[in-house]
Amino acid sequence: MIGKYSVIYADPPWRYAQKGLQGAAEKHYPTMGIDELCTLPVADLAAPDSVLFLWATFPQLPEALRLIKAWGFTYKSVAFVWLKKNRRSEGWFYGLGFWTRGNAEVCLLATRGHPKRQAANVHQFIISPIQEHSRKPEEAREKIVALMGDVPRVELFARQSPPGWDVWGLSLIHI
């Protein structure tokens, strides 16, 4: 499938080096260090004109920007900001954070070549409850399709197999 995908959607299994975060993700799935992530042949999957949507937490922003370059893309903007609500109540969800109690998570947008967006009315905010560890809201996939159209797309590090998406990942419920 070399050069096939116009959209690559990724939520890498970041390995945290900061004290206190080590092992949190590992309780749920295998993680990867930045050097290991950078060696993945993602550039080979991308069409000449393609978009990468890459989830990153704020502590991982430098690594996310490095990964974008390693995969052959150029950072453009923040595609989405996920404002997390509690799962069982109407309030906001707050993580522990480093300096302040964290809530939001960002999905970065990077391009290769000159992809064209199909809609100009896709908003950046996603306000939805947290789910199981690290699972992103379905609304993100819906917004990607609205923004880019029904083009060949793949989700890396997938935890499920949504209709219309090719998937790759260790955490698939079924293949």
State where each predicted segment sits.
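Short alpha-helix plus adjacent loop in nuclease-associated cores
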Residues: K84-W99
